[in-house]
Amino acid sequence: VHPGIDSHLLIQTDSAINPGNSGGPVTQSGQAIGVAFQSNLRLNDVGYFIPVPLINRFLADIKDGRYDGVPEIGIETSSLINQHYRQYLGLPEDTGGILVERVVPHSSADGVLLIGDVLTKIEDLQIDAAGMVRYSEQQVTFFIEAENRQIGDSLQLQVWRKGKFINLTLTLKAAPFGSEMRNSYDELPEYVIFGGLVFIALNRNYIHSPGNMTPPLAYEHWYREIERPR
């Protein structure tokens, strides 16, 4: 099931996952190592499964009987592979880092990170110029450190700002938008008929229904109302 707005760590395997088998255990040497997730119809004998760390994070989340979700840092970044741009920013030669291009309003990073910051370290992991960190002997995106934590946890960051390194702490929050931006499944839409008109909540499912959403209306709602609330 895809929410349509985020992605998380998966493991690719050369064992095909047949339709209908999603949600079953993936085993190796008699031990469960993950949950079957999806196949790739464009490739032969390629499947993906949810790894144990993500499963453990989910189980810890629901211990209180409620699912709070995966926290989001709330930034958009760009790589700093271009050496000339790194020199322009004054970054030391032996420093990696990823450039903060946008901070999502009301997110975990709002009020902590600034546009133009270079994020160089997350917890004890060095971030390279492509935004990757070394995690369990693999190169993965630095967002993995946030995904492994719970909402309300703290995250230690190091950034390059105005020619010097500074250390920051942010408190992880859920994404600053509601369920209306996520795909929903097996749920009938709620609506009200009044005066011959049908009123329905504006959500992702409705927007992706052919012909239901005009570009001006989409812009008005998603940008003005959600990203720039009055």
Label every PLM stretch briefly.
Residues 108-110, 121-158:
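PDZ domains, with a preference for the canonical peptide-binding region formed by the helix
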Residues 130-131, 156-229:
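C-terminal, low-ordered peptide segments at domain boundaries
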Residues 15-20, 24-25, 77-127, 214-230:
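PDZ/PDZ-like domain segments forming the peptide/carboxylate-binding groove
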Residues 13, 24-26, 30, 35, ...:
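Terminal peptide-recognition signature
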Residues 1-44, 93-96, 101:
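Active-site region of chymotrypsin-like
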Residues 32-93, 139-156, 160-165, 177-181, ...:
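C-terminal cap/linker of serine protease catalytic domains
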Residues 18, 46-50, 111, 189:
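Extracytoplasmic/periplasmic, Sec-exported soluble proteins
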